[in-house]
Every structure is written in structure tokens, then in C-alpha cells.
Amino acid sequence: MSERLSEISRHMRELRDAIELHNIRYYELDTPTIPDADFDKLFRELEELEQRHPELITPDSPTQRVGIPPLKAFPQVVHRTPMLSLSNAFTEGEVEAFDRRVRQSLGIAQVEYAVEPKFDGLAISLCYENGMLVSGATRGDGYIGEDVTLNLKTIRSIPLGLRAGDGSAEVPAFLEVRGEVLMLKADFERLNRQQREKNEKTFINPRNAAAGSLRQLDPCITANRNLRFFAYGIGVCEGGNVPHDTHSHLLDYLSSLRFPVMRERRTVTGVAGLLEYHHEINGLREQLSYDIDGTVYKVNELEYQEKLGFVSRAPRFALAHKFPAQEATTELLGIDVQVGRTGALTPVARLKPVFVGGATVTNATLHNEDEIRRKDVMIGDRVTVRRAGDVIPEVVAVQKESRPSNAKPFVMPEHCPVCGSRTIRLPGETLTRCTGGLFCPAQRKQAILHFASRRAMNIHGLGDKLVDHLVDNAIIRTPADLYKLGLAALAALDRMGEKSAGNIINEIEKSKDTTLARFIYSLGIRNVGEATARDLARYFGGLDRLMDADVETLQQVSDVGPVVAQSIADFFGERHNREVVEQLRAAGIRWKEGAGTQTTDHAAGSAHPGAAAASSKIAGRSFVLTGTLPTMSREEAREKIEAMGGKVAGSVSKKTDYVVAGADAGSKYDKALELGVALLDEAELIRLLQASQADNSSTHVDPERMV
């Protein structure tokens, strides 16, 4: 043997060893370390070398068999006819060559093909005797598989007994049905979520989840994994009225026996029909409920299939046309941190460019710090990247055996990479967040939109597009800048005339008169909704007391627990946020101070923040609003009641003191009558508010415009 031939032989041996290793990881361990596309490259390289040097083919070469030996944990089953795999095509030219070979072999001008999506699942065989399921096996190496009958019987889409749906099909004495076991995408996501909650191993993709679930020694585990089965053909058949003309009629027959078959299947003519179908299914790929990795073409006439026959490991009459790889391996060059509109910090992998899913990918999401730790991702690793359709590319696995010695762990930054504010991660949350909500450039648009929203400062006309214009043109940076806007600057914007600009300026000016609860809510403090903002305003009565409160004091407020208290303390503990709050006050925003219930030191001469509410006829009373009031909106009525220390509930109960009813009052009005709860109309509510306001005047607190 020449030196060059020896080198080729050595390389082929390395390829065989590598393919066998990856086969074991893929089929036995269900923990693949390389994407399918990389495996296909290794296999095709070995095939090409064997075609050029047939004298170097060995009996144990992976090209000479279909899969791998079965697991020793399951009994072995010898297939009555081999379960061969299909030859693959990756380009349109290879599909054209396949069609040409078929036509030339058959001596005909055009061929009709049965076509269907290619499942990305686990091939199995089901054997029925006199209509009853007696055994089921995996493909294994194509000749010997694993007996997984008990596990297969837990899959509800597999018939345990055969009967024709329309009465026309005759059940054979023996029937071997071949198909694919798979897991739907939604079930895969649910399974991985459950695995993470139990701190157990997660699966890379639905195919591996299906394989791992089917090979469980305990059938109860398989039963809980919600696997599905689809039939795609018949192996052996004895008796019955099974069609003998076309493959498509065979599938119709299986469907009549109540086997699930692919709905997207059809017949096409010629190579143009094959390629058109392939493009169509590729476009539908992300809409399907299950994973597919290509399309399958089979000569439809069964007589032609028999004439074409088989090569050593695949039929000549069929072809699998693969889609562009959705997974690929590349080097992780670094991890950058992006800040979203809500302040969430997201680690993003910076990658050596790699072509995957039909596009060149340079960045991929790592989701959060916990995911990085769970996957043990380090800078410098070789990683598997997945890109499916419009889904954001993500790092799904690490090739730890290839980890370089200089690989570096990732640490989430303690300060926001955009604005420099402190970052926090609250207990029970997976996301780290920037605390500079009012100041951070990454959060500007969201912060301003929330500030101006109807239930916050209620600035009509300040919508998404206008805020985009104002921020993108650096006209405003924080909510406080809204109160510095001039008519000329606004009117100069696209599609914004002087009249529209004047209306918005008036709305901004009107918003200066508000309530403390609305103002607190407008700041966008994480975990502080409208109800919590009202509780905080009622308890502290003034903004300074709230801003200076520590976590322990904050937890004295009704329904404020440790997480919410920490959010509030962190927000006001950030210098940038306090600066914006002071700018807002300086702009003229005002509200009534003093309607709190916090106890203070009277001996030191400080005013009692709860004095106003304490003497109010409304304080502590429970109200329910129903129907349409003549002059007030329900939101306005709520604010006036709460400003005097009252509470507004959503439903009527025995604890309700008053039901305020307007026009078209519904079931709440009826419930009040049934329970004997006092009913008020708007005029009576206003008189009650005025009486409470008069009582409060003796406390020397100056409430602004109560009614």
C-alpha cells in the first residue's frame, strides 16, 4: 500500500470511529454533542472516500449499516424485512440527479412521486396479528431493533387493535406498520420546563426528548411524556385487501385503519413538482406543531419501487431532501449584555460567524444568568447554535470536551452597561435588572410612555410614534423633559402641526395637577402597580417620607412584602432616579400631601400624616362603584374616595359600606339591595366628600381640590 493510500486509510478509520462515537451519543445516550449537519458532513466524507477507494471499505463501516446495535436493556427483535434509512440530498442538483436516475432506470419520461414532510423523530415498527398489536420495536441497526412494546402501548395515537373506519378495509392476518414516534414542540417545551423545575436534565430538541422518553425502562414515565405516532409505510403484510398499486393508496389504507398519517402528503409529477413541494413545506415549517428536517420523495407506483430495488443501506426509489441545517457549531468569542426596554439585562453570545438556518449568525441569546450556569457556558467554548425560522438564534449546548484551557466564566455586571446604575436580581426572579428606570437610555421610551399613560399622568396624545420621534431626535431624555417642551419644537416634527402641538402642550400642563398615588405609579417602579401605589400614598402621605423609607418600614404597608419593598428601596436608592423626581417636582407637578396613615413622633412636634384621613367620614370605609355617573368617571370617583382614606373594592360583600350607583347599574346594584348595603348616587357621594373635606380643615392640612 502506498504512503498516500495509507494516509487515506488512516483518515477513513478516524472518520468511522468518530461516526460510531456520535452514533452512540445520539441513539443510546440521547446526548448528541454535534448538530445533525456536522454528522452528515462526516458521513458524506466517508461515503465519498469509500466510493473512490472501494478496496478500503470495512464490514463494520457505518455506511454498511443503518443505525447502531440496540440497547442491552431491551430484548432484541429481528426485523422480518430490513428497516433501511434513506439517501440524503442537500441541493436541488442532487434532487435532479435522483429524478434522472429513476427515469433512466425505468425508461420513462416522467415519474409520479408521493411526497411528505420528513419527521425528525424515531423510526419504529408495529406488528399486528389478527388485528391485535403484539410487538413494537425501534429501527436499531436496520436489521435488529429494541423491543419497546410496553412503552409503545402507552402512546395513545397507536391503535392497540385494528378495525376499519369505514368498514371497507379488511384487517390482514399479519401487518407490520412502520412510522415515526415524535414529541410535539409544545410538549417538548412543557417537558423541559418541568425538568428544570425538578433540577433534572433537559433535552436539546424534541427528537432527543422523544428518543429518551421511548427508551425508559419504566413505561409509566413514557406514558407521561405525551409522545405521538405517525405511520408512513408498511413492512410485511399477509392477507387483507391492502392496496398493491401506489404508495399514496397504502397511506389511505392505513388512515382507514385509524393510523395517524401526515396531512401534508400529496403526489407530484417530475422534478419541478418535487422542488415546488420542498419550498412550500419549508415555508410552513415553523407553523407545524412538530419538528421536520426535510421532505421525503418516494416513487408512487409500487411496481416501479420493486423494479428499482435497494442499495446496501437505502432504497433506490426514495430520497430525503434535507432543509438547511438549523444547528451548527462555532466558537463563542465573548458575552455582551443588552438592556431591554423594561431594564432587563440579557446576556448575548458573540460568535464566530456561522451559517445556520439559511443565514449567517454572529450573535445568539443566552437568555439569563441561570441558563448560562445550567449549560455551563464559558467564553472561548465551542457551542451549538440553533436558528429556526424567525426565532432568535440561541446557544443550546456546549461541547465541553473541546473546552480550551483559557476559557473564562461569565459574571453578570453589577452596574448597567448602558447608564452605570446598579443592577439587582430580586429573590425568585431569573432576570437581572437595571435600577435606573427613569434615567437609563435603554429604558427611555418605555419609561416615558408609562409615565404618560392614562392611569399614570394621563397625558392624552403622547403615543408611541410621538415618543419615538422625541427620543430618537434627542428632544427628550427623561419624563421631566416633557415639561420643558416648547410649542415650536413640537410643531417642527413630521406630521405635527401647530394646533396638534398646542393640544399636547396643554395636556402636559394639565397633568401637573395629579394625586400622589398616580405620581408614584407613573415612576414605573418594578412590582408597584396601581393598587400598591395607592396603598403607599395612603400610608406615607408624602413623597419625601416614601423616598426615605427603608425596607423594614415599607413592609408595614398593606400587601407590601420583601420583594416589593426591595424594589421600591432600590429605585429610590439610585441617585439618577431621585434627580429625575426632583426635576419633575421643580417642573410644577403637585398633589395633596398629608393623607397618609403612618404614625409619627408627635412629641417632636411633627404633623400626623394621617390626620386628614383619621377625621374623615370616608376614612376606612369600603365603597363599590357601578354604572355610569353623570359628571364623574369611575376612575375620578375612585381617586376622590381614596384621597379621603376610603377603599374601593371590585365586588359587593357584607363588608361593603356604600355602593355608588349610576345609570345602567348591574348585578352589583342588585347585590347591594340583597345585602342591605347603603346606596348612593353621585350627588350623595359629592356631599359625603364635601362633609369629609370640611372635617379635615380642622387638622390644618391643606388638601388641594377635593371635588
From Swiss-Prot:
Record PROSITE patterns: BRCT, DNA_LIGASE_N1, DNA_LIGASE_N2
Keyword DNA damage: yes
Keywords annotated in UniProt: DNA damage, DNA repair, DNA replication, Ligase, Magnesium, Manganese, Metal-binding, NAD, Zinc
Names of the cofactor(s): Mg(2+); Mn(2+)
Record lineage: Bacteria, Pseudomonadati, Pseudomonadota, Betaproteobacteria, Nitrosomonadales
Active site (record annotation): K118 (n6-amp-lysine intermediate)
List of residues binding Zn(2+): C416, C419, C434, C440
GO molecular function terms noted in the UniProt entry: DNA binding; DNA ligase (NAD+) activity; metal ion binding
Gene, per the UniProt record: ligA
Catalytic activity field: NAD(+) + (deoxyribonucleotide)n-3'-hydroxyl + 5'-phospho-(deoxyribonucleotide)m = (deoxyribonucleotide)n+m + AMP + beta-nicotinamide D-nucleotide
Function as written in the Swiss-Prot or TrEMBL entry: DNA ligase that catalyzes the formation of phosphodiester linkages between 5'-phosphoryl and 3'-hydroxyl groups in double-stranded DNA using NAD as a coenzyme and as the energy source for the reaction. It is essential for DNA replication and repair of damaged DNA.
Entry's EC annotation: 6.5.1.2
Entry protein name: DNA ligase
The family this protein is said to belong to: Belongs to the NAD-dependent DNA ligase family. LigA subfamily.
Residues that coordinate or bind NAD(+): D36, A37, D38, F39, D40, S85, L86, E116, R139, E180, K298, K322
